[in-house]
């Protein structure tokens, strides 16, 4: 069979269990008997969420972005260091050779299109499913949201991408060319408009992990921010805030305490729901990489390997509670105090900083229960602050939005009387303190085109020189995908 540019997988089942079907191009005959009742429609949308889990459990969306930025870095080993050193090529040759594909942008491309494919089938088939009409609309709205999220994930990583809005039912319709970035965003906004119309408002009785109308509004706001549609970003961020459906968790530490993740749901608009069981469907392994080797406070099976730059650690305002999840020492399982210089003797850098956002002392080996947060209410406030400043300058409203986040961090209100640009810069800094380790910072640097000046200043003994160039704003489209799709062209800077 001809190799497809997208790996196409459909999961079916009548419970939370999922069965992967043989990889193949779909036909109408192949799917004619599915989506015929409510149970199958529910199974189909559950599979869409499950496919997204496959992307995030690998860590690729975090690692590809965070290791390129100025907050966290990986242990300097071959294959893992190419993102931090900007030494990858269009074929991701080193990652392929040294078994690091699951940490690379290749995984983002593959998993995003798997999820889009499954969402497309829901959008195409479920509207005709005989079932409760309200729930049917909700399911289709969830699929529109997920398709928008994946297209947005792709475009912020790769720039111009293939927009895929129809399910694959032949080999021929997999040979599709790229759309411009503007065209991609048009599709994203169209999908999110439909999602908002079909999704319900959030309530505390929501099924865990499901998206709401407010989730679609916040994703719309964030996509508009990236697309520099400031008024649109402001309108949608304000809609989330003004709905009062979500509230900030009072304690930043509680927000990232695995045992309190039900409490955290009051702030989380979209996440990947995970657990610490040996069930391979919903394991979390993100915590495994951030924990020092042998620390029951972090988890029961951590290997270490991802650390925080000391420059970022030292950037916090005195008393900022967000810094409490960073540490320069730890106590190991034997009860021995481990000082900063001995955190990881494999590295040349001796001013290592540990990150505790993904601690899980009740982990089962490599499996933790930390959910992965993709959209939370703090983002709505900071998007509103930045967008308001672009539209109306450093207004009282702009200050009120950013200070809401600073209040939770227990730091003073932002200095009054800032210029428009100084306020926007302060908002970007606030985002850095708020969302470190959540796969966000690199995109703030690239969308503002500040990565070329910021990154070279963030170095250490293991990465003494870091020199991104203009082409690093977007990752190259994996060469294997271009080889499989005659209509797909590489990004101009990577040809």
PLM features: residue spans?
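Flexible, polar/acidic helix-loop-strand segments at domain edges
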Residues: 83-98, 314-376
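Conserved, well-structured interaction surfaces
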Residues: 37, 42, 46, 50-56, ...
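Bacterial Sec-dependent N-terminal signal peptides
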Residues: 1-27
């Amino acid at each position: 069979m001809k190799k497809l540019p997208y790996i196409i997988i459909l999961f079916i089942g009548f419970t939370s269990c999922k069965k992967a079907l043989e990889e193949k191009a779909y036909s109408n005959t192949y799917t004619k008997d599915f989506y015929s009742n409510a149970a199958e429609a529910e199974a189909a949308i559950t599979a869409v969420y499950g496919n997204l889990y496959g992307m995030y459990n690998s860590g690729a969306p975090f690692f590809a972005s965070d290791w390129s930025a100025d907050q966290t870095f990986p242990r300097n080993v071959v294959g893992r260091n190419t993102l931090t050193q900007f030494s990858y090529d269009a074929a991701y040759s080193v990652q392929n050779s040294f078994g690091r594909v699951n940490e690379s942008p290749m995984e983002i491309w593959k998993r995003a299109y798997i999820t889009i494919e499954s969402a497309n089938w829901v959008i195409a088939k479920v509207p005709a499913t005989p079932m409760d009409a309200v729930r049917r609309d909700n399911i289709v709205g969830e699929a529109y949201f997920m398709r928008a999220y994946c297209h947005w994930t792709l475009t912020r990583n790769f720039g111009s991408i293939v927009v895929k809005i129809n399910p694959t039912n032949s080999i021929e319709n997999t040979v599709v060319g790229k759309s411009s970035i503007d065209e991609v965003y048009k599709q994203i906004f169209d999908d999110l408009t439909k999602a908002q119309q079909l999704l319900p408002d959030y309530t505390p009785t929501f099924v865990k992990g499901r998206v709401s109308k407010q989730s679609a509004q916040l994703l719309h706001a964030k996509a508009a921010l990236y697309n520099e549609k400031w008024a649109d970003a402001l309108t949608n961020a304000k809609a989330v805030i003004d709905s009062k459906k979500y509230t900030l968790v009072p304690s930043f530490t509680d927000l990232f305490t695995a045992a309190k993740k039900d409490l955290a749901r009051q702030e989380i608009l979209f996440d990947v729901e995970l657990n610490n069981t040996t069930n391979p469907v919903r394991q979390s392994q993100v915590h495994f990489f951030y924990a020092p080797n042998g620390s029951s406070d972090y988890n029961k099976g951590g290997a270490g390997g991802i650390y925080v730059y000391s420059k970022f650690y030292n950037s916090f305002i005195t008393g900022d509670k967000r810094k409490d999840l960073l540490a320069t020492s730890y106590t190991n399982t034997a009860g021995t105090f481990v000082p900063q210089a001995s955190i990881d003797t494999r590295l040349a850098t001796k001013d290592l900083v540990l990150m505790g956002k993904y601690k899980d002392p009740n982990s089962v080996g490599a499996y933790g229960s930390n959910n992965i947060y993709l959209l939370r209410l703090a983002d709505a406030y900071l998007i509103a602050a930045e967008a308001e400043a672009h539209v109306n300058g450093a207004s009282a409203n702009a200050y009120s939005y950013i200070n809401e986040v600073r209040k939770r961090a227990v730091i003073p209100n932002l200095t009054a009387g800032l210029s428009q640009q100084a306020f926007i810069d302060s908002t970007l800094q606030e985002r850095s303190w708020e969302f470190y380790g959540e796969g966000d910072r690199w995109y703030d640097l690239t969308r503002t085109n500040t990565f070329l000046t910021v990154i070279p200043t963030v170095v250490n003994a293991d990465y003494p020189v870091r020199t991104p160039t203009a082409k690093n704003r977007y990752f190259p489209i994996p060469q294997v995908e271009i080889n499989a799709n005659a209509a797909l062209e590489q990004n101009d800077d990577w040809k």
